[in-house]
């Protein structure tokens, strides 16, 4: 299954607030669908599936990518759910978004893909690059890069900059101070249900 490229607001209405996916908030109270969905008690499977979908759509991942990250997280000592979130949060595209250098994750992905971002003075155009403590992030010095990011910074942010990141808005220079903590993850979801979903496949 490839990365979703359809209407973002429809997904947000179905799954709830996904800060990485869209800045828009639906004014409709009914869930997505022609007449909304009938309210009924969800099954355990549907609950696990919904949490998995939240993760996939918020971080803009394909099913194959998310499955790969689950396998990586399971090989690391510790809570698989927390490690999974840390892997996703430390992706370069997500770090750019959490710093406020872009209004959404899709916009952050474009900044990275188009070569606007430097890591430790080297251009990195791979969105999945795993940032680590000590990394220095800069915006390219050329006017097109600087002006685009400055325009993005003028947008009101949906979530604040987490404690493990710091940003100088004048120089457009940022630093990663630590691995993200669970309480700094902006997405409201239950990562344990995602681990259960893949464990039962």
From Swiss-Prot:
One of its GO terms (cellular component) is small ribosomal subunit. InterPro entries: Ribosomal_uS4, Ribosomal_uS4_bac-type, Ribosomal_uS4_CS, Ribosomal_uS4_N, S4_RNA-bd, S4_RNA-bd_sf. SMART domains: Ribosomal_S4, S4. GO terms for biological process: ribosomal small subunit biogenesis; translation. It comes from the Eukaryota. Residues 90-153 form the S4 RNA-binding domain. It is found in: Plastid, Chloroplast. The keyword Chloroplast applies. PROSITE patterns: RIBOSOMAL_S4, S4. One of its GO terms (molecular function) is structural constituent of ribosome. Part of the 30S ribosomal subunit. Contacts protein S5. The interaction surface between S4 and S5 is involved in control of translational fidelity. One of the primary rRNA binding proteins, it binds directly to 16S rRNA where it nucleates assembly of the body of the 30S subunit. It holds the Pfam family Ribosomal_S4. Belongs to the universal ribosomal protein uS4 family. Keywords: Chloroplast, Plastid, Ribonucleoprotein, Ribosomal protein, RNA-binding, rRNA-binding. Coiled coil: none annotated. This is Small ribosomal subunit protein uS4c. It comes from Gracilaria tenuistipitata var. liui (Red alga).
């Amino acid at each position: 299954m490839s990365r979703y490229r359809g209407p973002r607001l429809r997904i947000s209405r179905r799954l709830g607030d996904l800060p990485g996916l869209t800045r828009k908030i639906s004014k409709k109270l009914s869930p997505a669908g022609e007449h909304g969905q009938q309210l009924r008690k969800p099954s355990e499977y549907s609950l696990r599936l919904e949490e998995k979908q939240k993760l996939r759509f918020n971080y803009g991942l394909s099913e194959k990518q998310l499955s790969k990250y689950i396998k990586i997280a399971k090989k690391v000592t510790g809570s698989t759910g927390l490690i999974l979130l840390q892997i996703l949060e430390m992706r370069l595209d997500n770090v750019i978004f959490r710093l406020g250098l872009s209004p959404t994750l899709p916009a952050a992905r474009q900044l990275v893909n188009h070569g606007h971002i430097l890591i430790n003075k080297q251009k990195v155009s791979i969105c999945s690059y795993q940032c680590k403590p000590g990394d220095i992030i800069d915006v390219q010095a050329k006017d097109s890069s600087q002006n685009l990011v400055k325009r993005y910074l003028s947008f009101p942010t949906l979530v604040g900059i987490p404690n493990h990141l710091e940003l100088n808005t004048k120089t457009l220079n940022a630093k990663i101070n630590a691995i993200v903590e669970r309480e700094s993850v902006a997405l409201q979801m239950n990562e344990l249900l995602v681990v259960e979903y893949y464990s039962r496949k």
